[in-house]
């Protein structure tokens, strides 16, 4: 039931208030991120700007969204902080986004925005509104360093782990028969199975997998495949009717690119041109926000009925 689903989601939410800052995430080599430009901020829907923002991110993905104690790091964290400052929000509360429950966090009011390596798809756009995209990547493979697996065509007969509710899982089921699929709620669960040699590969977006390859406990334990085999565009998700907020987030993302903050955040969190494809290092073109949906109530407050 809906009540049970909400209870399950609440159990994995750990909100911690943090002040939006002008620096990138607390990671080695992080650099200063400039504040949003004040000249463009005046064009926002300031009367609607909340004093705080609840943002759902992953808690277990190095370089993308990672929680260590009360410290948060990753590209999604940096983008969330930049957006918050741009729209005039003074405080962010981060909550955990488990892949299968991202839409539920928005629907139940436990999050205002979701930045969690969340690929924009037509089906998802029926349920939520996406601003962005803010990153372009593709599905890849994470394997042990000595593995001979390089491409998805080599996967039949092997066991592959992916995250429940992800586009990566859909891709394997629809287009790559003959492999054995293990599905877990969190990507870190899959990576643990790979390190323990219980699966032969992990699949997810390449930008996410590169973080696990860099953070593996010993040098040359894990590596990513050299090619990607889908196109994924990460968006900032919000409730379906939050069209004004969508416009504001798009303005913030455009400003982040213009100031150079986007490029610095991507390179400091995800790597350099030697480890990432060109498209991931290039700001993607922002898509237009959807038009506001017509009201379902009449001028007298009643709900129209069909004849």
Can you annotate each of these PLM segments?
Residues 58, 135-143, 206, 210, ...:
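Periplasmic-binding protein-like
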Residues 19-117:
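Extracytoplasmic small-molecule ligand-binding "clamshell" domains
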Residues 104, 117-126, 174, 200-230:
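A ligand-binding cleft/hinge motif common to bilobed small-molecule-binding domains
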Residues 81, 92-154:
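Acidic, polar ligand-binding/catalytic clefts
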Residues 13, 77-87, 158, 166, ...:
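Extended ligand-binding regions for polar small-molecule ligands
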Residues 170-184, 220-223, 253-305:
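Ligand-binding clefts/hinges and TM-proximal coupling segments of bilobed small-molecule sensing domains
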Residues 92-104, 147, 167, 182-196, ...:
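Short helix-initiation/N-cap motifs at beta->coil->alpha
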Residues 8-11:
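C-terminal motif of bacterial Sec signal peptides marking the signal peptidase cleavage site
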């Amino acid at each position: 039931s809906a009540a049970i689903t909400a209870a399950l989601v609440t159990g994995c939410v750990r909100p911690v208030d943090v002040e939006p800052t002008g620096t990138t995430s607390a990671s080695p080599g992080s650099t200063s991120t400039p504040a949003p430009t004040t000249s463009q901020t005046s064009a926002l829907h300031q009367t609607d700007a909340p004093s705080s923002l609840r943002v759902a991110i992953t808690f277990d993905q190095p370089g993308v969204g990672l929680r260590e104690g009360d410290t948060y790091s990753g590209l999604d964290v940096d983008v969330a902080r930049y957006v918050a400052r741009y729209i005039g929000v003074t405080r962010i509360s981060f909550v955990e986004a488990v892949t299968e429950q991202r839409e539920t966090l928005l629907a139940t009011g436990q999050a205002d925005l979701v930045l969690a390596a969340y690929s924009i798809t037509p089906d998802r756009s029926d349920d939520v509104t996406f601003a962005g995209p803010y990153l372009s990547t593709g599905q890849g493979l994470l394997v042990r360093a000595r593995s001979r697996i390089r491409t998805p065509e080599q996967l039949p007969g092997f066991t592959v782990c992916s995250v429940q509710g992800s586009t990566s899982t859909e891709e394997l089921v629809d287009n790559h028969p003959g492999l054995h699929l293990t599905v877990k709620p969190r990507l870190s669960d899959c990576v643990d199975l790979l390190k323990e040699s219980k699966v032969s590969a992990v699949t997810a977006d390449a930008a996410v997998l590169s973080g696990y390859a860099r953070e593996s406990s010993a040098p040359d334990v894990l590596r990513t495949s050299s090619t990607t085999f889908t196109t994924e565009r990460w968006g900032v998700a919000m409730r379906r009717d939050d069209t004004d907020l969508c416009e504001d987030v798009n303005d913030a993302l455009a400003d982040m690119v213009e100031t150079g903050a986007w490029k610095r955040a991507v390179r400091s969190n995800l790597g350099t041109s030697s480890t990432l494809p060109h498209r991931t290092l290039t700001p993607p073109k922002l898509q237009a926000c959807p038009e506001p949906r017509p009201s379902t109530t009449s001028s007298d407050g009643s709900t129209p009925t069909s004849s």
